[in-house]
Amino acid sequence: MARKRRLTGEAALNAAYGKSDHAPLLEAWGVDLPDDLLRLALTHRSFANENGHLPNNERLEFLGDAVLGLAVAEQLYRQFPERAESDISKMRSGVVNMYALADVARRLGMGDYILLGRGEMLTGGKDKHSILADSVESMLGAIYLHHGFEVARATVLRLFAEKITEAPTTGLTMDWKTVLLEKLSDMKLPLPTYEVRGEGPEHDKTFYATVTIEDLVTHGEGHTKKVAEHAAAKQAVQKLNERA
């Protein structure tokens, strides 16, 4: 008997997308989307590349990232009128970082719907922070294209309401050392090493921290060792995000 031929291209995409009932997902998001746009929002580059370099959801992610950032920034501006710009910026980081987005994605059950390549599936891609976070942004991009900014904004405020309310705490005290450890675990990289030195008189010391992860070296400074280490860890996370 001849072996069944593996589907590729649009046929593979339609077959994979058709395996799921997307009504529960759209209900969780509280919106409707046409199949072609929803299918694109759920198509990870690993699936697209394995099936003839199909279009993937990265352009929608780009759009959704902008929508999310503006919606959250405006809400923080209105909800916390007494806060300085520097505080609002940190608060926004606490709401829209990869781990916060991944948390929202898990709550919505996104992992069960993302179309992944075989390699990503085998390495637990449907529960990776980065993939889940990207899927939230691509969905927001799709919602914006189909419904406009007001619906997209309302969706953001509904899904992120708790995180926005908690932003004065989570955003201003973000544990960058923990975030870095989670990032390294996702990327299968070794643990970081920290070196800290202090300069200046005892009553007014400045601490300088260095984080090393293989060939990546980042630096931070502050008036305590903890602040310096967290500043260096934050720089490391940002550099790793650029590489991802």
Curated annotation (Swiss-Prot):
* Cofactor(s) listed in the protein's UniProt record: Mg(2+)
EC number(s) per UniProt? 3.1.26.3
Q: What class of enzyme is it?
A: hydrolase
GO:BP terms for this protein? mRNA processing; regulation of gene expression; rRNA processing; tRNA processing
Q: Which GO terms describe its cellular component?
A: cytoplasm
Chief localization: cytoplasm
* Domain DRBM as annotated: residue spans: 175-242
One short Pfam name that applies is Ribonucleas_3_3
Sorted UniProt keywords: Cytoplasm, Endonuclease, Hydrolase, Magnesium, Metal-binding, mRNA processing, Nuclease, RNA-binding, rRNA processing, rRNA-binding, tRNA processing
Q: Where in the cell is it found?
A: Cytoplasm
Q: This protein is called what?
A: Ribonuclease 3
Gene (UniProt): rnc
